[in-house]
Amino acid sequence: MGEPTPTPAATYSAADPTSAPKLADLAAIKYSPITSSIATPEEIKAITQLWVNNLGLPADTVGTAAIDLARAYADVGASKSATLLGFCPTKPDVRRAALAAQIFVANVTPRQFCAYYAKVVWNLMLATNDPPANWAKAGFQEDTRFAAFDFFDAVDSTGALEPAECSAAPLTATCALDREVRRPCPSAYPERQPHHQHCRGHQGPSWLHQHSLRSACTPY
């Protein structure tokens, strides 16, 4: 006869890596999500401090400057090769490109920086009815034009800054709809792989036609 099957322990033991936790044990585990694709609040603060120290930005305006920079990246693509035009709205003698250069000094990429502000940028565009500049060229339709920026995937990430108020429909529902129909052309975002039409167990076209994307992707 073989060895008898051991009886599971009545209580979870953290000292035993094979001990089976109960739901109450899992609830007691404190976990903070960390992703390398989104800048951390500490990294964002380090970048804005560089703006103050190296470019002379007033310390009480760095938040506005950061949101403006992320919004500008939404128009041109959040990459090292992006050409940023215009000036910082809180210090008109400083170019946006100069602000962007300090991002690299902090060892952060433009995509990571922008991803932190994805929810803010998205709601800003909805509130002002001002989608990314090249949405049509990027292959988006009018109903999904507000999703036409290359850090949109961070809109429903817990690592992105959450606006105090949202001008859009609930993020999770709207993001599910927007991501479902995103079909940017390969030349617009070459790093993206083909997106299969499925979302939360629902299949593509037949499910999508039952929803009003216009109401989900435009401001109230």
Swiss-Prot record:
Keywords: Capsid protein, Helical capsid protein, Ribonucleoprotein, Virion. One of its GO terms (molecular function) is structural molecule activity. It is found in: Virion. It holds the Pfam family Flexi_CP. Signal peptide: none annotated. Its main location: virion. GO terms for cellular component: helical viral capsid; ribonucleoprotein complex. InterPro entries: Pltvir_coat. Belongs to the potexvirus capsid protein family. Required for genome encapsidation. Forms ribonucleoprotein complexes along with TGB1 helicase and viral RNA. This is Coat protein. It comes from Cymbidium mosaic virus (strain Singapore).
